[in-house]
Design a protein with these regions (language model features):
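C-terminal helix-rich "cap/oligomerization" subdomain common to oxidoreductases
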Residues: 11-16, 21, 145, 195, ...
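Hydrophobic residues in well-ordered beta-strands that form the structural core
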Residues: 1-2, 26-28, 57, 152, ...
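Predominantly a Rossmann-like dinucleotide-binding segment in NAD(P)-dependent oxidoreductases
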Residues: 32-132, 257
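Beta-strand-loop-alpha-helix segment that lines the small-molecule cofactor/substrate pocket
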Residues: 1-33, 48
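Active-site loop of classical SDR/Rossmann-like NAD(P)-dependent oxidoreductases
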Residues: 179, 208-220
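Short, well-ordered coil/turn segments that N-cap beta-strands
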Residues: 22-25, 52-54, 136, 146-148
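C-terminal "lid/loop" region of Rossmann-like NAD(P)-dependent oxidoreductases
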Residues: 197-211
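Contiguous beta-strand/loop segments that form the cofactor/metal-binding neighborhood of enzyme cores
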Residues: 92-186, 220-231
């Protein structure tokens, strides 16, 4: 199933329940989990090398890259704009790294500030302002039940140079990590501040540079083995449903002006 798994949490829940009842494989297309930087950082998180992750940022910012094809600008068919399109990847990656899906509350705000402009400079060609029926940027603040917090930022069009997509920044008690300019790990060693940049592409030979396996290929191969051999899913349907629930809560909070509390 392509991301996001559904437009709202009720639909996502129904999908999870149906998969469980029928014994069918429900796999959600969060392929950014399979990138080499993501897999490396996940192993660090599993080994508790970052310690308790209590603050994180989920990044999905474009300066001017509004998708002008298909139904991306149609709220009824798409469900929303950049939040549900690319914000979903960043949030999924962040929650997965934290291994924390216990959400306490969500506060959010959406904006449609640049959609009516005709001087666009868009990477995918000019959009039609009259067809632009979704937000052009959205921001959320997510509080977890253990006290950890996540900031989510998503935009197709925003006057910023801090562009990042499907990236996460993590702050733990032992170390921190971000995906700016490659994967960077920061920590204190011998009373000094250290930044480590793992070589993830098989480097180390003067005449050869390793080639990274595309995340999409990894995802397809794993799906085959899940179906054919019973391999364990990396993207659990229940996890993807939580992502959908948080996105829906951000939209709801933006409309109501209130914080949305989870059960």
């Amino acid at each position: 199933c392509e991301k996001p798994m559904a437009k709202n949490y009720a639909e996502a829940q129904k999908m999870v329940e149906t998969a469980e009842k029928t014994g069918r494989v429900l796999n959600i297309g969060y392929q950014n989990r399979y990138r080499s930087d993501s897999l490396y950082l996940k192993e660090m998180c599993k080994a508790d090398e970052l310690g308790e992750i209590y603050f994180a940022k989920a990044h999905a910012l474009r300066r001017r890259a509004v998708p002008t094809w298909g139904v991306f600008l149609n709220e009824e068919e798409q469900g929303g704009g950049p939040l549900i399109d690319i914000g979903t990847h960043a949030l999924d990656l962040t929650l997965w790294m934290m291994d924390n899906y216990e959400v306490e509350s969500v506060t959010g705000q959406t904006f449609r500030k640049l959609a009516d402009q005709t001087n666009q400079g868009n990477a995918f060609g000019n959009w039609d302002p009259e067809e632009f029926c979704v937000e052009d940027s959205a921001f959320g603040f997510i509080r977890m039940k253990n006290g950890a917090v996540i900031e989510l930022e998503a935009a197709w069009a925003l006057n910023t140079l801090e562009v990042d997509e499907a990236k996460t920044s993590l702050c733990g008690t032992k170390a921190g990590a971000d995906m700016k300019d490659g994967l960077r790990i920061n920590y204190i060693h011998h009373n000094k501040q250290v930044v480590e940049k793992p070589a993830l592409s098989g480097e180390g030979v003067a005449f050869f540079s390793g080639e990274e396996k595309p995340a999409g290929d990894y995802e397809q191969e794993l799906f085959y083995h899940i179906v054919a051999d019973g391999a364990e899913q990396i993207v659990k349907p229940a996890q993807a449903a939580v992502v959908t629930r948080v996105l829906e809560a951000i939209y709801e909070s933006a409309k109501s002006g209130k914080t949305i509390y989870f059960d």
